[in-house]
C-alpha cells in the first residue's frame, strides 16, 4: 500500500495542473479512504513527525497495514503514538511518506478542494458566509440613526 501511495504522490508532484491532479486522483480510486484519513480535519493524530524524529528510540507497537496504522493512531496518545509511528517506519520503511501522512500533508500540492473535485463530498469543509452590502437590501436606510456599533474585521458564526 505504501508503494502505491508513494507512486500516487510522485505523480501528483510531477504536474502543476489542477485538472491533471483531479484526473490522477479519479483514476486512483483506491486512494479515497487514505485521503479521507489524511486530509479530514475532524480526524486528529496525537503526534507530529517532529516529535517522532526527536524520540526515535521509542518503538514497540505493531501495525499490519496503513489502514490499521491510521486507525490505531487516532485512538492512541502521547508516547504510544510515537512508538507506533517509529515501529511502523522500522517495519515498512518509507520514512518521509509516513511522516508526511502523520503531519496530514503529503506535500504534493493538493488540498480538500482538489480532493472534493475528484471525490465529491469526501472531505468535509466549513466556510464562513460573507456579508453583503446592507444598503442594497434594507428598507430603513433613509431613517435617522443615533449610533451604530462598528465591528471592524470580525467574523462571526451564529
Tell me the role of every PLM-derived stretch:
Residues 1-158:
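N-terminal nucleic-acid-engaging modules of covalent nucleotidyltransferase systems
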